[in-house]
């Protein structure tokens, strides 16, 4: 079997086991945390809290999470390395850039169409993270991440999507995305990726579980991509029963082999008051799928075989397909 890089080093893809394909550990605005550190508080306590929560997840039967925290979401790999070293859970880390609008100012002058023009420096950065490691940690990214939300394909967002597509073709690392499903943004992403020559079967279109539009989901699948049914617990966007129903319905339509399950949860998110989350979204945590979602899916006719496909087989297949291409 092929190998996949994790925060503790490479593993055989056969050892991924039960995998949640769209999670986070810490999400923060790094400059805010550095200059106004009160909300973050004690580093050791935050790390210990994450170790405990991920340990609970491992004990519940999950073997691997994919941490899709990239530039723009506060990625800091030395912190993730500390967490990974103290838990048996595999953590696959990501590269890419998260924005709904413009690129960070660092990229303003350099790159295609910018004042100083030149090649896309983002692509080279992403490739370095995958092939050589992130900063001086020696930890290599295993997946690429980008986002398209309500503003749509702004110039900055389109630039990131194309850079991610180019890095994917050079490395073979799969792509996973954030989308605004209600506005069918996954189709925009597929169009840009296709223009860049991406094999869309190597792409997970994220947050598809926010939608109950079967036509939209069928269109994404027809183009080849996987559906990320990956926001279980974010009931303020789509309620629990709707999320369960759409997964069950797509399974009925024969698409268990094109879906992955996850929560998009984290141990810390500085954009939301910590006391608010348990009140507004009490199910938004790492254990929700195993505690609540799986039993509900079974009640709706989803079989153990289909659950194994979505939680084990599909993640393995996504990461097994390796190598760059033209």
Swiss-Prot record:
Keywords recorded for this protein, A-Z: Hydrolase, Metal-binding, Zinc
Residues the entry annotates as binding Zn(2+) 2 = 145, 178, 207
This protein's cofactor list reads: Zn(2+)
Record: residues binding Zn(2+) 1? 22, 24, 145, 264
Q: Name one Pfam family in it.
A: PTE
On cofactor binding, the record's note says: Binds 2 Zn(2+) ions per subunit.
InterPro entries in alphabetical order: AryldialkylPase_Zn-BS, Metal_Hydrolase, Phosphotriesterase
Q: What else is known?
A: Was identified as a high-confidence drug target.
Stated family: Belongs to the metallo-dependent hydrolases superfamily. Phosphotriesterase family.
Protein name stated in the entry: Phosphotriesterase homology protein
Q: Which organism is it from?
A: Mycobacterium tuberculosis (strain ATCC 25618 / H37Rv)
């Amino acid at each position: 079997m092929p190998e996949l890089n994790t925060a503790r080093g490479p593993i055989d893809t056969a050892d991924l086991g039960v995998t949640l394909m769209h999670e986070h550990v810490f999400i923060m605005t790094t400059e805010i945390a550095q200059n106004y550190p009160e909300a973050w508080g004690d580093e050791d306590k935050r790390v210990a809290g994450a170790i405990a929560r991920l340990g609970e997840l491992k004990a519940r039967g999950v073997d691997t999470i994919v941490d899709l925290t990239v530039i723009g979401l506060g990625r800091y790999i030395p912190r993730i390395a500390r967490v990974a070293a103290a838990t048996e859970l595999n953590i696959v880390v990501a590269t890419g850039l998260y924005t709904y609008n413009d690129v960070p100012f660092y990229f303003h002058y350099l790159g295609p169409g910018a004042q100083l023009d030149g090649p896309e420096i983002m692509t080279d950065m992403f490739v370095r993270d995958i092939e050589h490691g992130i900063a001086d940690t020696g930890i290599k990214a295993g997946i690429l991440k980008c986002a398209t939300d309500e503003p749509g394909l702004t110039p900055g967002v389109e630039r990131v999507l194309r850079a991610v597509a180019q890095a994917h073709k050079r490395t073979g690392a799969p792509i996973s995305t954030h989308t605004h499903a209600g506005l069918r943004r996954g189709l925009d992403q597929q169009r840009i990726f296709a223009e860049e020559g991406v094999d869309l079967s190597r792409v997970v279109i994220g947050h598809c579980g926010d939608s109950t539009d079967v036509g939209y989901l069928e269109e994404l699948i027809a183009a080849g991509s996987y559906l990320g049914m990956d926001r279980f617990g974010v009931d303020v966007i789509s309620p629990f029963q709707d999320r369960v129903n759409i997964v069950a319905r797509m399974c009925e339509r024969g698409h268990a082999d094109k879906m992955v399950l996850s929560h998009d949860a984290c141990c810390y998110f500085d954009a939301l008051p910590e006391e608010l989350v348990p009140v507004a979204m009490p199910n938004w945590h790492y254990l929700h799928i195993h505690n609540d979602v799986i039993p509900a899916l079974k009640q709706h006719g989803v079989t153990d075989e289909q659950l194994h496909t979505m939680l084990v087989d599909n993640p393995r297949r996504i990461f097994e397909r390796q190598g760059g291409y033209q």
